[in-house]
């Protein structure tokens, strides 16, 4: 089967540090921290009081009130990010093209806030008074479905629910779908909005979240002081396109997708394999998929959650794959700025990785103070760096043992 080349021609994002992909990337380049006290509910009585919320997003600025009411917040953000990606790509499909255009968008939790609200409504008013919009606005796949409705894309439409790796799986699956000839254009990525009492309470009970009250000492990947992640929210959508299709219409190409690997630890519900072997295999598969060698990779946008087990395990994984080259490459965590956006994380981080290649810039791991001997690689501490990058990986590791890695290449016409 012919291996077609796949490029990125459009980006859209809503994150804790910006309401567009461009705003978010500029904030990341500037080292802006999106962690702050929770505002979406009163966290009094909770051990965790910080989150990385999206600030200033008003859905009615982008759609009618009636449309907004028929979407959960996670879907609203995904649809707006998809429109941004389409606009940046300058792509309006002809009617006959729409069967060759598809959507793959992940969400790990979907409309959790909707579930909480409707549960309270059912208890108070009777279960037959639950909103008829509860199910279609709350289910995880509705972000993908609403994007397809908004764009008219009639090809493959899917929602990988692989926890924190979902956004990366969406990008990787879309890449393979185009590469192998099943589509010409795919909107792909992830979305999440789960800053709710139930989610905060659940993750806190697992001891997964940082209980720090200092926004600059909560999401601190690879730092010896780290003690949990900060829950974030947002959406990231990429428009992937077959190369000739993009060139024929004169599209502006941002980066090329060249490899994808996915594995499972098959080890534990939430903990990664301590030796990093599952994540290592995902990276190795992505590198082999691209027909390059490990020493050609110069930068990794890591999963880097700020949990003790993840960061040491991912460091071990990098050493397994790259050997001596691990000390030469750079790897940073933009979750130090955005928090952990769960199903949206991998998509937003793929966007940042594409822009790292385009702009020749490696973002920092901010608020880094105390080195950890178990995380002894170059984490680009505190200050981002300019670099002429050619290949970069974006990693995601999810509960359930899901590992995903996407390999991107600098676009050179």
Model-found features: residue ranges?
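Acyl-CoA/ACP chain-elongation machinery
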Residues: 182-227, 260-274, 304-311, 328-378
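Active-site-proximal alpha-helical scaffold in enzymes
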Residues: 78-91, 140-143, 148-192, 230-251, ...
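ACP-dependent fatty acid/polyketide chain-elongation machinery
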Residues: 1-67, 89, 244-256, 351-365, ...
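A glycine- and small-aliphatic-rich helix-loop capping segment at beta-alpha/alpha-beta transitions
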Residues: 22-27, 113-127, 177-180, 200-213, ...
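Conserved beta-ketoacyl condensing-enzyme motif
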Residues: 8, 24, 29-162, 191-200, ...
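Phosphate/pyrophosphate-binding loops at sites that engage ATP/ADP/AMP, CoA/4′-phosphopantetheine
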Residues: 85-97, 246-252, 283-299, 321-325
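Glycine-/small-residue-rich "gating" segment that lines the acyl/pantetheine channel
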Residues: 124-131, 169-172, 176, 192-248, ...
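Condensing-enzyme catalytic core mediating Claisen C-C bond formation in acyl metabolism
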Residues: 5-9, 33-37, 214-290, 299, ...
């Amino acid at each position: 089967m012919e291996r077609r080349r796949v490029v990125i021609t459009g980006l859209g994002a809503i994150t804790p540090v910006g309401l567009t992909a461009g705003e978010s990337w500029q904030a990341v380049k500037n080292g802006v921290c999106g962690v702050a006290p929770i505002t979406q509910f009163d966290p009094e009585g909770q051990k965790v009081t910080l989150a990385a919320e999206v600030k200033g997003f008003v859905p009615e600025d982008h759609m009618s009130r009636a449309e907004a009411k028929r979407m959960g917040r996670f879907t609203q953000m995904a649809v707006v990010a998809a429109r941004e990606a389409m606009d940046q790509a300058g792509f309006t499909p002809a009617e006959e093209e729409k069967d060759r255009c598809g959507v793959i968008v992940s969400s790990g939790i979907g409309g959790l806030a909707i579930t909480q609200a409707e549960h309270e409504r059912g208890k108070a008013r009777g279960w037959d008074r639950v909103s008829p919009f509860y199910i279609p606005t709350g289910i995880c796949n509705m972000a993908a479905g609403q994007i397809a409705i908004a764009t008219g894309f009639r090809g493959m439409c899917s929602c990988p629910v692989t926890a924190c790796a979902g956004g990366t799986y969406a990008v990787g699956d879309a890449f393979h779908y185009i590469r192998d000839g099943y589509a010409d254009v795919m909107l792909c990525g992830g979305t999440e909005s789960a800053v709710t009492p139930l989610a905060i309470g659940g993750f806190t009970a697992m001891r997964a979240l940082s209980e720090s009250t200092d926004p600059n000492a909560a999401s601190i990947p690879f730092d010896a002081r780290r003690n949990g992640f900060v829950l974030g929210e947002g959406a990231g959508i990429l428009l992937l396109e077959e190369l000739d299709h993009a060139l024929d219409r004169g599209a502006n190409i941002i980066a090329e997708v060249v490899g994808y690997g996915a594995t499972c630890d098959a080890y534990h519900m939430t903990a990664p394999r301590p030796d990093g072997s599952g994540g290592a295999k995902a990276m190795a598969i992505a590198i082999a998929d691209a027909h390059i060698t490990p020493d050609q990779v110069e930068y990794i946008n890591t999963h880097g959650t700020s949990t003790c087990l993840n960061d040491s395990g991912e460091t071990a994984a990098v050493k397994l794959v790259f050997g001596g080259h691990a000390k030469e490459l750079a790897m940073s965590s933009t979750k130090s700025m955005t928090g952990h956006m769960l199903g949206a994380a991998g998509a937003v981080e793929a966007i940042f990785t594409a822009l790292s290649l385009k702009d020749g810039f490696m973002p920092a791991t901010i608020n880094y103070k105390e080195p950890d001997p178990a995380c002894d690689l170059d984490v680009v501490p505190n200050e981002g760096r300019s670099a002429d990058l050619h290949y970069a990986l974006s990693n995601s590791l999810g509960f359930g043992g899901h590992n995903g890695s996407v390999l991107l290449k600098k676009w050179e016409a």
